């Protein structure tokens, strides 16, 4: 089969044998691709650090039966350096990479919108001009939108009655009106759902004015909504959540998420 080229974001890697690695790539035109980088762990490897997580590359690959083979790599963007040099940025970026891999779907299924969103979000994290927690929640909300899982925030998830509505129920699909509100719904403080809507829509002026208590509550709802749809917990989110401890909120995001998930499991 013929060689092909594609722009790719390195999501993760793991060792293969004594000198090789398998890399997982989110490509612009071919979706999720897993490929072998031969000799990458050798000191004089031609790939260097260009196949580390967060690297954004122009890759040439040879199609294989189970795994493709990386034959050439050219760096496109150097934002990886700014991300891995700071723990907060690194953990935020790791959560984005894990989410991208979970939402990309089957291998080789084109996911250009998710690819573009993820690269843009990582660039924003590297720039450091906006709060990391807001960037992560905005990314998760928009990524869920691409997957068809975005929570209803401005209308009732069940009857589509325009909001705003006070209650939120993950299994129902987001905000719910007083008539559709299931048992076990949570009632976020006023302004939390508006913050989530601002993050989804890119209204950074509104989002950055939200108090930290609202931002923490919104993070819990976003994480719970995503993981309910994934039917599994993201391994990287607890690491990100530890960075919020300095704000001394009354309850940790992890506790809120666990409580919300238990409510939805109990209430269907």
Swiss-Prot record:
One GO process term, biological-process aspect: double-strand break repair
Record's keyword terms, sorted: DNA damage, DNA recombination, DNA repair
Keyword DNA damage in record: yes
InterPro entries assigned: ARFGAP/RecO, DNA_rep/recomb_RecO_N, NA-bd_OB-fold, RecO, RecO_C
Disulfide topology: none
Gene Ontology CC entries for this record: bacterial nucleoid
Record keyword Ion transport present: no
Highest taxon above the source species: Bacteria
PANTHER family noted in UniProt: DNA REPAIR PROTEIN RECO
Family listed: Belongs to the RecO family.
HAMAP family in UniProt: RecO
Function summary: Involved in DNA repair and RecF pathway recombination.
Protein name: DNA repair protein RecO
Organism expressing this protein natively: Mycobacterium leprae (strain TN)
């Amino acid at each position: 089969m013929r060689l092909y080229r594609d722009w790719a974001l390195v999501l993760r890697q793991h060792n293969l044998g004594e000198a090789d690695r398998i890399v997982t790539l989110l490509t612009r035109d071919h979706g999720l691709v897993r490929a072998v980088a031969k000799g990458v762990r050798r000191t004089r490897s031609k790939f260097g650090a260009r196949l580390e997580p967060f690297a954004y590359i122009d890759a040439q690959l040879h199609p294989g039966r189970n795994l493709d083979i990386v034959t050439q790599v050219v760096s496109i963007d150097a934002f990886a350096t700014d991300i891995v040099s700071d723990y907060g940025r690194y953990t935020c970026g790791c959560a984005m990479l894990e989410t991208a891999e979970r939402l990309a779907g089957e291998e080789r299924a084109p996911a250009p919108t998710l690819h573009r969103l993820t690269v843009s979000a990582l660039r924003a994290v590297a720039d450091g001009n906006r709060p990391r927690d807001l960037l992560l929640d905005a990314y998760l909300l928009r990524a869920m939108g691409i997957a068809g899982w975005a929570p209803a925030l401005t209308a009732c998830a069940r009857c589509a009655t325009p909001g705003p509505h006070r209650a939120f129920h993950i299994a129902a699909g987001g905000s719910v009106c007083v008539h559709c509100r299931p048992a076990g719904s949570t009632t976020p403080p006023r302004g939390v759902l508006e913050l989530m809507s601002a993050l989804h829509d890119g209204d950074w002026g509104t989002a950055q004015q939200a108090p930290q208590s609202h931002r923490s509550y919104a993070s819990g709802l976003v994480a719970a909504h995503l993981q309910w749809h994934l039917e599994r917990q993201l391994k990287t989110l607890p690491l990100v959540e530890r960075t919020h401890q300095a704000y001394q909120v009354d309850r940790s995001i992890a506790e809120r998420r666990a409580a919300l998930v238990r409510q939805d499991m109990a209430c269907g």
